[in-house]
Amino acid sequence: MSDWSLSQLFASLHEDIQLRLGTARKAFQHPGAKGDASEGVWIEMLDTYLPKRYQAANAFVVDSLGNFSDQIDVVVFDRQYSPFIFKFNEQIIVPAESVYAVFEAKQSASADLVAYAQRKVASVRRLHRTSLPIPHAGGTYPAKPLIPILGGLLTFESDWSPALGMSFDKALNGDLSDGRLDMGCVASHGHFYFNNIDSKFNFEHGNKPATAFLFRLIAQLQFSGTVPMIDIDAYGKWLAN
């Protein structure tokens, strides 16, 4: 009989994330450096544990009309079926059709940060996305419906007390349209998600928050399926400009 413990493995994953986020908070005094370090912890976690069809990175998102999103701390995008990802001077630019999820990653949750994250998420969801019919041996399948882009917030701490209480809920309910934050994690306290059945936010306290958030994200990505077939010609027209 093996000496492995699944419970201990899950706990170790969360403890590693929490420790590294805490170290970033203590070790860096400059807000920009502190933010970059925290962002890097979340990106590394997602790149390590999400299936390899997904990639996570700090990126801009662009559509075929030439519109760009704000810079997004963590973009989860398709790497298996995406025909192109731009990289220029260390900046990554992802076509809107390839995006599964976007997250704002900062040190501590607050009303201002929630509103800021909502604006960032909305800047991605408002982009134009194409979807072409899919060819097969007998003809074509209809164009795949566009998948919902998940939005969220990732932090180490919360400015509120209690950390996941009514104030947090009020801030999240400030935008339930293009800027809605579907899920997120406050690594020191718990995670949250929007319950589509009850149309309200649920808060889960403790219980290895980083690991619980990761599992919920993976489950949501499974329901998303694959990204639509991108219209390359719609992007190619910019070659003539």
From Swiss-Prot:
Effect of residue 53 to A: Loss of endonuclease activity
EC number(s) on file: 3.1.-.-
Keyword line: Antiviral defense, Endonuclease, Hydrolase, Magnesium, Metal-binding, Nuclease, Nucleotide-binding
Name of the protein this chain belongs to: Endodeoxyribonuclease NucC
Gene: nucC
Species assigned in the record: Escherichia coli (strain MS 115-1)
UniProt site positions, description: Gate loop latch: 136, 141
Homology family: Belongs to the NucC endonuclease family.
Consequence the record notes for mutating residue 27 to E/K: No hexamer formation, no endonuclease activity
Activity regulation statement: Activated by cAAA and to a lesser extent cAA and cAAG; cAAA and cAA are products of its cognate CD-NTase. Cyclic nucleotide binding causes hexamerization. Cyclic nucleotide binding causes a series of shifts that enclose the cAAA molecule, enable hexamer formation and juxtapose pairs of active sites to allow dsDNA cleavage.
Gene Ontology BP annotations: defense response to virus
